[in-house]
């Protein structure tokens, strides 16, 4: 039986687990499999880069090769996991080199979450973007730069679908960068899931002072091409020109691999207090995990916690367990910083 630890996913959860594990175990072979380049960057920086004038490449804090060398990890970048055999403790992965099988002692799923896609009509519906990775940000950045370089074009304009955490952060960032921002949300106030009404009202006022326009109790009906730009039709019938349409309506745990392997999945991959899934020797953490350590009134399987601090706590506990010291995950009160410089906020998760 293989003695290797395999981590699937090179986001904060995957790399932090590798780093914490290496503090405790310097000899066990570690493989990290990722569909992207594996470069390490702070995902929260994606929603405050425009105002700082930072280019996509400047958001990478450590190249993947350097991370792998520092942590003595075998990196399999641009490689997709096609299947997991829980009985044989193997996974099939495919890269440009072809298909290969990897055996594991323990497997960690850090597959993250995927942006929720809201169906809209129109011939430019596929132009609606979500920013859930550095690659997504690079495409969005290029689109706005193209608009800025077009002679005679008016001020760049972005329509954001969703007034939640990510929507408000991007609205603040883009407005500070000189972009005209309009936010459309079916609810009645910004950050309704995290803030009481008084705080929501204060945030709305602060963002409006930057020029952000809100359309509450409203949705996007269609997105069409129009004279080199996009034309957004709201449910009210109003049409709004835009250089880009950004969907920020939320994330859904990426559970496809886990479901195909027969693991227990609810809103995310269900894990116990030791972060073990329903299969022996397979663990999960990060945005793809549903933690028994975070009780919920909505599910007997606990809660998802798609924030930075829970990931750090989970990675430390899991690393200890993987290194031979079973450690139950205990969450303390963890603040969530809302990156809206117009009105800086910290919310208890």
Language-model features, listed with the residues they occupy:
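Mid-to-C-terminal Rossmann-like scaffold of FAD/NAD(P)H-dependent oxidoreductases
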Residues: 2, 288-349
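Beta1-alpha1 glycine-rich phosphate/pyrophosphate-binding loop at the start
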Residues: 2-73, 172-194
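Rossmann-like dinucleotide-binding cores of NAD(P)H-dependent redox enzymes
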Residues: 60, 155-159, 165-222, 310, ...
């Amino acid at each position: 039986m293989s003695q290797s630890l395999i981590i699937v996913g090179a986001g904060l959860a995957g790399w932090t687990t590798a780093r914490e594990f290496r503090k405790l175990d310097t000899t066990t072979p570690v493989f990290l499999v990722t569909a992207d380049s594996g470069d390490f960057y702070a995902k929260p920086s994606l929603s405050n880069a425009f105002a700082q004038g930072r280019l996509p490449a400047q958001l990478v804090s450590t190249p993947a090769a350097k991370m792998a060398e520092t942590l003595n990890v075998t990196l399999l970048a641009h490689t997709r996991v096609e299947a997991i055999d829980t009985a044989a403790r193997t996974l099939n992965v495919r890269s440009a080199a072809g298909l290969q099988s990897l055996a594991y002692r323990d497997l960690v799923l850090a597959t993250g979450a995927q942006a929720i896609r809201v169906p809209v009509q129109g011939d430019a519906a596929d132009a609606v973007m979500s920013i859930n990775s550095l690659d997504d940000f690079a495409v969005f950045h290029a689109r706005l730069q193209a608009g800025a370089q077009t002679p005679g074009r008016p001020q760049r304009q972005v329509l954001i679908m969703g007034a939640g955490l990510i929507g408000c952060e991007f609205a603040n960032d883009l407005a500070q960068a000189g972009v005209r921002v309009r936010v459309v949300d079916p609810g009645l106030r910004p950050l309704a899931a995290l803030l009481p009404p008084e705080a929501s009202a204060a945030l709305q006022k602060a963002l409006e002072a930057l020029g952000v326009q809100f359309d509450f109790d409203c949705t996007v009906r269609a997105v069409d091409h129009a004279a080199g730009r996009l034309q957004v039709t709201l449910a009210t019938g109003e049409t709004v020109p835009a250089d880009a349409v950004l969907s920020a309506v939320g994330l859904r745990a990426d559970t496809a691999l886990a479901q195909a392997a027969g693991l227990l999945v609810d809103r995310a991959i269900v894990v116990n207090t030791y972060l073990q899934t329903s299969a022996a020797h397979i663990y999960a953490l990060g945005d793809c995990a549903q933690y028994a350590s975070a009780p919920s009134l909505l599910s007997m399987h606990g809660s998802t916690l798609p924030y930075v601090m829970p990931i750090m706590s989970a990675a430390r506990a899991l690393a200890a367990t993987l290194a031979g010291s079973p450690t139950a995950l205990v969450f303390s009160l963890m603040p969530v910083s809302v990156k809206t410089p117009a009105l800086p906020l910290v919310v208890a998760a």
